Regions:
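Hydrophobic alpha-helical transmembrane segments
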Residues: 1-39, 63-66, 73-149
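A mid-sequence, solvent-exposed acidic-amphipathic segment
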Residues: 50-51, 67-71
Length: 149
């Protein structure tokens, strides 16, 4: 829900206010933002898989379990980046969106840290949330600059 609000609604509403009319293309630009916001929230749920499950809280991560939660993380950000690059390929944004890939080493480190935990304690992963937030930041800036050009 947060991804939809901060992605689709905020991006589309902002574009509509600036342009003084609704343009359906703003939804295409908003989709990567939905993925980025959801990607941060998903990562933040990973360290608490065991505690959430023990407390009766249902999250996507604890439904999936640790193995599948890692798989989803490994897929998530590449899909976000492909959706951003697709904006350029479809002519909705300029080439600066390619700078979203600057976050690739950060993503790579985060997924390696998750994999290294295996079935053990994932609480330590909370310390590395900055990696995913930096993926969001670099991807977001690349989208802003790419759309502005």
């Amino acid at each position: 829900m947060v991804g939809i609000n901060l992605g689709l609604i905020v991006v589309s509403a902002s574009a509509t206010i600036i342009a003084q009319s609704f343009d359906i293309r703003s939804l295409a630009v908003a989709l990567p933002v939905v993925g980025m916001v959801a990607g941060i929230l998903y990562y933040q749920s990973l360290p608490e898989i065991d505690t959430d499950k023990a407390g009766g809280k249902t999250t996507l991560a604890n439904i999936l379990g640790k193995d599948h939660a890692l798989l989803v993380f490994r897929i998530w950000w590449p899909v976000v980046w492909m959706s951003i690059i697709n904006l350029w390929l479809s002519g909705l944004a300029g080439w600066p969106v390619l700078f979203c890939l600057v976050g690739l080493p950060l993503y790579w480190k985060a997924q390696k840290l998750i994999a290294a935990r295996g079935d053990g304690d994932w609480l330590e992963l909370d310390r590395y949330g900055y990696l995913v937030r930096l993926c969001y930041l670099t991807s977001g800036i690349s989208c802003i600059v790419g759309v502005a050009l």
